[in-house]
């Protein structure tokens, strides 16, 4: 993967600074954050180019090992999207992405988003994450476009369908794979 591939994916006009037509100054890219798996393609090598455009690179949707996640942080990744979700689980011999929250190898510790909705994570997992790096802890929702819709089955991306049942969203045809959460706000 190259930066040109990212330009094709996101649109060059959205991922690069542009000139303001009124005063000729450089405007930052429209895209402010990219979440990607650092072990895929050539992504870790692209992190400095991404962050050099004032775009936050967030580790997520990943099978990255601790070493791969550490390399991403060393290259400029400053965030983890939805810690513990859609990523390699914590293992005692390879802590995966979670391991970069510890103080090691003089790397900065990234911020991390946690979905604390009672469905995505066990409360103890949330406490462990918070206690590992309280200054990096960010509460996020996994709210989706179905907010306010009645219970039912809805079309999603790539021909998949989502089942909305109360506040729980699951992917149709699976054994309850979490697809998101519907919430008004935190209590």
Regions found by a protein language model. Give the residues of each.
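Active-site-adjacent C-terminal substructures of enzyme catalytic domains
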Residues: 46-50, 59, 68-187
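Histidine/acidic-residue-rich, glycine-tolerant segments that coordinate divalent metal ions
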Residues: 1-95, 148
């Amino acid at each position: 993967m190259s930066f040109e591939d990212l330009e094709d994916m996101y649109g060059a006009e959205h991922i690069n600074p542009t000139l303001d037509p009124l005063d000729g100054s450089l405007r930052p890219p429209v895209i402010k954050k990219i979440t990607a798996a650092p072990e895929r393609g050539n992504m870790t090598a692209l992190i400095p180019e991404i962050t050099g455009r004032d775009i936050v690179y967030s580790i997520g949707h990943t099978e990255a090992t601790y070493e791969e996640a550490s390399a991403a942080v060393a290259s400029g990744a400053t965030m983890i999207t939805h810690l513990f979700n859609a990523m390699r689980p914590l293992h005692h011999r390879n802590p995966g992405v979670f391991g970069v929250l510890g103080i090691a190898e003089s790397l900065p510790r990234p911020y991390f988003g946690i979905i604390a909705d009672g469905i995505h994570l066990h409360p103890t997992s949330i406490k462990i994450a918070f206690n590992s790096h309280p200054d990096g802890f960010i509460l996020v929702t996994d709210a989706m476009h179905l907010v306010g819709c009645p219970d039912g089955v809805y079309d999603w991306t790539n021909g998949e369908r989502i089942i909305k049942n109360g506040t729980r969203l699951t992917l149709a045809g699976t054994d309850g794979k979490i697809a998101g959460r519907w919430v008004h706000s935190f209590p």
